[in-house]
Amino acid sequence: MIKKQERMYTSGEIHSILHPWVSEWFRRTFDDFTEAQRYAIMDIHRGRNVLVSSPTGSGKTLTAFLSIISELTRLADDGELEDSVYCIYISPLKALDNDIERNLEEPLSAIRDIAAGEGRDLEIRKAVRTGDTTSYERSRMLKKPPHILITTPETLSILLVAPKFREKLSTVRYVIVDEIHSLADNKRGVHLSLSLERLQHLVGDFTRIGLSATVHPLERVARFLVGYSYGSERECLIVDVSYLKELDIDLICPVDDIVAADPEEIGNALYDILHDLIEDHRTTLIFTNTRSGTESVVYNLKSRFPESYSDSNIMAHHSSLSREIRLETEEKLKRGELKAVVSSTSLELGIDIGYIDLVVLLSSPKSVSRALQRIGRSGHQLHQRSKGRIVVVDRDDLVECSLILKNALEGKIDSIKVPENCLDVLAQHIYGMAIENPWDIDHALAVIRNSYCYRNLSREDYLSVLSYLAGEYVELEERYVYAKIWVDYDKNQFGKRGKLARMLYSTNIGTIPDRSAAVVKCGGKVVGRIEEDFMEKLRKGDTFVLGGRIYRFNYARGMTVNVTPASGPPTIPSWFSEQLPLSFDLALDIQRFRDIMDGKFQYGRSRDEIMEFIMSYLHVDERAASSIYEYFREQYLYAGIPSIRRMLVEYYTGFGGRKFIVFHSLFGRRVNDAISRAVAYVIARRYRRDVMISVSDNGFYLSSEGKMGGLEAFRELEPENLRNVLKKALDRTETLASRFRHCAGRALMILRRYRGEEKSVGRQQVRGKILLKFVSELDDKFPILEEARREVMEDYMDIENAIRVLEWIRDGDMEIKQINTRIPSPFAFNLVAQGYLDVLKYEDRIEFIRRMHQAIIDEIKR
């Protein structure tokens, strides 16, 4: 049963359960317990599962560890502390693991000194175990295991099949999952949930402690953390003190009219604002949504304000930079040496980066929870305000960010979705279970169903994965995919096959697929990585930006690029990076705002009245409200406002007589991707004609030289048939091929590493396509193929909410209004311009939108 913690304990009550040495250390170090600690420590001490959601600087880590350290101290004081693991701390980041080890050193050494003062020798060990741990360190851990083991989800699953170390896990009483919100919504979390159930089966009940940033609904994350006990929901207390920190958030529109302004004016205003914000604060963290955006901001600030910024006081931080450069950036931040750091997503999670007094979000982060998480990196101490500024870049961005601002200030957060019944991850874990020891088939299924992610796993899907692993698809041997387990149906058991099972498992586990990237070296030092596609475009003498610095390309050998430092104007790299999708919940809030605005115009409200409403409702200033007002007014007068109750379908003829149909379906890119592909498939089947698709968060368009019947094709889609139509639309696409390669790697159909050799991503891709074709012809319901389809439709796209949209239309809750326009309506500008991204520079795209805007103004005046 999941319950919210209502009781806050007194300091005296908490000190009474702490070992005297631990209590003494705490009194010397802190004035008092934080709210999170008052709510959680007593129940962790009692062995209850707890999920803590609290802001940065609220003592979350100590909340989890204090009673554990106290219990270990008591065991050591009584001479009962064994040489084995009592607590496992799991985080998604190796850097966070290293932070935690450093942060634990202070209390453990201080408590050790207090004990020594009483003539007692206290040794509580902690250690980090990740893929970076050396063989020497691993050997030491076997002889002297840490009492607190700090690790990652992937390493935990390896330790579960390591025979000698498994014995050291038999005393585990506590598991802490940090940054649980960043694991719960992806396959790393699914993988971890099964590892926790396997650990529970090995050692018996243990206390589960989850630490989370602001997330909704907390009940779902709590269920993900604790799972089930053979059909019954395990108990968990939710400690929610995410409200504690005061928020200082504002939205900045760089110019008075974001459409009428030319690109140079917008660029100048944008960087002047960024410069002023940085100058007014000690340390500023700027978030962009792409790595290319990160590089561009660093380069522009240094080139526009050379007297203020150099390599010594502003740096970039993103996943394509080398580990050494990322660590250098983090260390300089901690020491207060940087004025500003620009990041894409790599600094969102809670690694220790010292004092940040301002966070700037450059353009929409696409969800309220991500905005709060990023802004929460500022004001590290509990009673300091989290200060954030959202700088917008166009009118769609302005509306989106205004709703993010409103929801953030009002505490309305998007829902988290936890993937379920992932058959590739299941295959990996069944193999791991078989390596541990032979299992009863039914008992193994019961243990698997204890995971929240597999609570509804069908027996049919489970047996199909067993069948694949047992080599019952004998034809796969022709493609070098061999049986990994044996199954005895008479005895109802399965177990491992082969002497290399443990090696194969340990070197191929995990859920993060290998990506194509080339190493960039300057003078023998690795400075970062670039995408393979980008490397192929480089010619000798080309210059590009990496880590905020300019390099000249000399040559490439294999997957290594040789460069030298350069100066002058660079070519900003077009990194391959999936854009962040707009959350469905936020999309609906924007649609509701559109509906309210539509009503205001229909009832003839005055400009002043509507302006007052916008400023009050969205918490924005007059400049932002004016741009929003004009944007909606133009759309209303020209074509009508699409909203939660009305989907506009806009027909117009473009350059050279090309036909366009724009669907104003503001439901986020993931929903629109699903619907648009299904519509395009129906058109192709009906008219034997391929159509061009362009998809955004705000809608999608179809384009063709001739008749398409787009609306007719859309009306053919029903809630009941969308999944089947989309399944057919996805077959033989690069999207499915890519996802199948990832799933086949997780399910160990494609071995990324074998006997010390690593298979390149290129070879994996080729092998994936061969296997996809083979299994499609062998059995259309092959479990890993089914999983690849599920991943595309449910995780990459959002078919569930796409079906909801079709239900609204079927039930009459949303009407479809067809319109014909000479020029695309204002709400369609960005979507239409997006289709020209490959042939238009950014400045030309802005100019294209400005010209369309002027044409609309002229049309309205007629």
From Swiss-Prot:
Pfam families given in the database record: DEAD, DEAD_assoc, Helicase_C, WH_Lhr
Coiled coil (residue ranges): none
All residue ranges annotated as the Helicase ATP-binding domain in the record: 41-233
PROSITE patterns linked to this entry: HELICASE_ATP_BIND_1, HELICASE_CTER
Protein EC: 5.6.2.-, 5.6.2.4
Short motif DEAH box, span: 178-181
Reaction equation(s) it catalyzes: Couples ATP hydrolysis with the unwinding of duplex DNA by translocating in the 3'-5' direction; ATP + H2O = ADP + phosphate + H(+)
Region Domain 4, residue ranges: 514-862
Domain remarks in the Swiss-Prot or TrEMBL record: Composed of 2 helicase domains, a winged-helix (WH) domain, and Lhr-specific domain 4.
Purpose of the protein: DNA helicase that translocates in a 3'-5' direction on single-stranded (ss)DNA, probably involved in DNA repair. Most active on three- or four-stranded forked DNA; flayed structures and Holliday junction (HJ) substrates are unwound slightly less well. Also unwinds 3'-tailed duplexes; both RNA:DNA hybrids and double-stranded (ds)DNA with a 3'-single strand (ss)DNA loading strand are unwound. Substrates where the helicase loads on a 3'-ssRNA tail (DNA:RNA and RNA:RNA) were not tested. Blunt-ended dsDNA is not a substrate.
The protein's name: ATP-dependent helicase Lhr-Core
Protein species of origin: Methanothermobacter thermautotrophicus (strain ATCC 29096 / DSM 1053 / JCM 10044 / NBRC 100330 / Delta H) (Methanobacterium thermoautotrophicum)
Lineage: Archaea, Methanobacteriati, Methanobacteriota, Methanomada group, Methanobacteria
Encoding gene, per UniProt annotation: lhr
